[in-house]
Amino acid sequence: MVREGEERIGNRVSLGVIGVSYRETTLQQREQVLHILQQAQGSFRLEVFQEEKDYVLLATCHRVELYSVAPAELFDSLAQEIELLGVSPYFYRNQDCFAHLFCVAGGLDSLVLGETEIQGQVKRAYLQAAREQKLSFALHFLFQKALKEGKVFRAKGGAPYAEITIPILVDQELRRRQIDKKASLLFIGYSEINRSVAYHLQRQGFSCITFCSRQQLPTLSMRQVVREELCFQDPYRVVFLGSSELQYALPHSLWESIWDIPDRIVFDFAVPRALPSHTVFPHRYVDMDQISDWLREHRKEVNSAHLHSLREVAYRYWNSLNQRLERRDCVGANA
């Protein structure tokens, strides 16, 4: 749904994005920024603005961002709150906001350069926001065009091939720890990252893979267990946590037994982390901070020509948006 009576983007109101990524922050800092931005969603109805502002919250393993059409004061307020954490957030407005999201969707701003998962993450964040709010035309336009051009960019071979990915790194870590391919692996949560790791390991010969989800998954080719039947006393050698809501979705008594199996390894892909840091055994626990460090060691440099090409496309769409808004203003004035 598109919100009616949208205020024209100009000096007072910007189409902007504020956020942090793997470049500026640790995992713990991104968790703290996510908390601030989640709280900000509830405070967008401010008396000074006298209307509810729209937003899209994009939270992934390596970035936390809030996109909105809002006054500069709102972005400034969020930036000041984030800076109290000792973090310097980035803020892009108008055409630079377009260029940023186009590069994100195209995989050029990812820690895993050229990754495809970010396209789906951007789409899901946009669709969730569209279901819950009456988004402005500008936000609809921004996300729809960024998703479209991200696909086109990949189809034309603009996005580099990601040689080192999270599934590959997980596979390497299991080999380093000499995990037998007949070992029992448990994936809790049917998230995209859990699925990509599970299918990669299956292709590498791991044959005892179990998924645990809120409900039965009829098309899954792997073993399944529903949450009500989950027991950490079962001999799962490796456990993969794919969703931050698991910390509260599963009973505390169940979590207490996650370390009971000797030498069990836990991969926590969630942001915020599914397991609080004070409850883990460091030598048996891998979170996204450690994975990010591994990925940095293998990260390729962005091709400047690819970056320039995608930004130019974004700028053209920004100009197109302004032309459309001008036509809407003219139609409204003549009505």
From Swiss-Prot:
Residue stretches spanning the membrane:
none
Question: Which residues are catalytic?
Answer: 61
EC class name = oxidoreductase
Instruction: Give UniProt keywords alphabetically.
Output: NADP, Oxidoreductase, Porphyrin biosynthesis
One GO BP annotation is:
protoporphyrinogen IX biosynthetic process
Which residues does the record give as substrate binding sites?
A: 60-63, 110, 115-117, 121
The biological pathway it contributes to is: Porphyrin-containing compound metabolism; protoporphyrin-IX biosynthesis; 5-aminolevulinate from L-glutamyl-tRNA(Glu): step 1/2
Tell me which residues are marked as the site Important for activity: 100
GO function term, MF aspect, one: NADP binding
From the UniProt record, list the reaction(s) this protein catalyses: (S)-4-amino-5-oxopentanoate + tRNA(Glu) + NADP(+) = L-glutamyl-tRNA(Glu) + NADPH + H(+)
Q: Name one Pfam family in it.
A: GlutR_N
What Enzyme Commission number(s) apply to this enzyme? 1.2.1.70
Q: Where does NADP(+) bind?
A: 189-194
Its family remark reads: Belongs to the glutamyl-tRNA reductase family.
Tell me, how does this one assemble?
A: Homodimer.
Q: What else is known?
A: During catalysis, the active site Cys acts as a nucleophile attacking the alpha-carbonyl group of tRNA-bound glutamate with the formation of a thioester intermediate between enzyme and glutamate, and the concomitant release of tRNA(Glu). The thioester intermediate is finally reduced by direct hydride transfer from NADPH, to form the product GSA.
Q: What is known of its domains?
A: Possesses an unusual extended V-shaped dimeric structure with each monomer consisting of three distinct domains arranged along a curved 'spinal' alpha-helix. The N-terminal catalytic domain specifically recognizes the glutamate moiety of the substrate. The second domain is the NADPH-binding domain, and the third C-terminal domain is responsible for dimerization.
Q: What does the function comment of this entry state?
A: Catalyzes the NADPH-dependent reduction of glutamyl-tRNA(Glu) to glutamate 1-semialdehyde (GSA).
Q: Which protein is depicted? A: Glutamyl-tRNA reductase
Query: What is the protein's species of origin?
Result: Chlamydia trachomatis serovar A (strain ATCC VR-571B / DSM 19440 / HAR-13)
